[in-house]
Amino acid sequence: MTPVVEIELVDRSMSQSNAMLSGLGISPGLAVGQAFVFRDILHDLERYDIGTHQVEYEHGRIERAVERVLADLGLSAERVEAELNTDLALIFRAHEAMLRDPVLTKELREELEQELVNAEQVVKRVFRRWERRFRAMASEELRGRGDDVADLGRQLLQALAGIRTHVLENMPPNSVLVATRLLPSDTVHLSRKSVVAVVAEFGGPASHAALLTREMGVPAVTYVSAACDAIASGDTVLVDGFTGMVAVAPDAETEAGFEERVAEQRASWAAARERCHDPATTLDGVATAVMANIGCREDAVLAAENGADGVGLYRLEQLYLSRKALPTEDELLEIMRSTVEPVAGKPITVRLLDVGADKKLPSVDLSSEVNPFFGRRGVRVLLAYPELLHTQLRALVRLSRERDVHILVPMVTLAQEMKRLRELLVAAMAEVGAKRQPPLGAMIETPAAALCVAEIMKHADFLSIGTNDLTQYTMAAGREDPLVSDYFRDDHPAVLRLLRLVFEAVGNTPLALCGELAGRVDVLPFLLAVGIRSLSVAPPLVPTVKWTVRQIRLK
């Protein structure tokens, strides 16, 4: 965990010249700028003992710090909601909930009463313990929440110290931010007018900072070893968010060549955006549907603006996870109806709720899982909690009366799961008096599902391959784990062979591809060559993917 933060603006005369650093690209794009290095400095926080008569005073300091941080979190959520989207604002709403947790409040009080030390030491010790608990958890997603705990602890210590202004608010224009780790409270202070790219030593593609930088359209590279030591403030830095390469203080020839690539990228993006509403058809006439992944209405608006042919993956998780109580059937229907309104008239694939023990749902206890990624998740949870599934099926059947709705079942492993889902869907139709059955599809996300796809498709109207989890389970490597990041390759031959195997088995059953791989323009020729004709990508990528399809000749 990082206690009180101060900023060290590193400006060394002996920085590395023309050095090439490598990491993991977590937000695509190319950028050139001047390095702005900032790091959290671990201080020997002032420590002093207190008497029992001073406990209330120190506790009052903690309470006031909590209230100040809660106010700041509220402002951060409002800012992100206004400038980016509602889903990302939920990051800060979740931080508010964590800070209000009565268990945390009790532990802070007990630490103060038992140890009789000042408020700063109490906050430091308690949040360090909480961070270690999260870092030790089996679930990759829960381990990632250690960043959230560290962030909150740091903000409380800043509040106790009276630090108000965040240095990132005063970054000069054309800056490449170089940091040890970028936490959500840092990211919210970034300005598109100032920061052109981010380089960090830690933070995976599913981190909150990654989500925020992608939404801002800022190229970002993480897992760059010793970045804060290898790069000095003021250095010219070239950042390739596609390949994860970072060039420091490049020579004139290298910089000129990179500037040409940046200009080409801008020109191609402009051309792609201009034709984003045109069909994506290869040079030899093969049509490909380029759909969008969405999680909220703002995503749907962007998808429509960028020419998406429909919604290939509507995720319901944020809808559920942002609530204190499970939505009723009517509430769920109204939210989904409002969300998909911007893409009216186009096909919409809604994935049933995909949760496990790594995602806490109100009124649903999944905490007993030994390993959430190898336990009950996706369809397994839905079948274990029939009412949770029943509400979704009824709402989706009702929505299908108004929209071209397809229902996608997550994390299917066995054909029996799809058979049971079909039975429950038919029952839900009878209950609401619906005559037309929405197409029911299976998500292929595990090697078992890929190898047994012939049996699964007997009970499915369509299939969708989720390459993120398929890669994770095939390569036995988590996306967030830097120790195995070299193994997490969605273009590895093992993954691509599974894709080919699935396509060869499906025959005339419609098949779509979603996940990070679907937006990889370098892999598009292979995907189209094996027969993929429907791709679902993040809304900002739709124009580029459609433009790339038009440059490909298959025969």
Give the role of each language-model region:
Residues 270-555:
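Conserved alpha/beta-domain cores
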Residues 1-342, 348-355, 381, 385, ...:
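Non-catalytic, soluble scaffold/interaction modules
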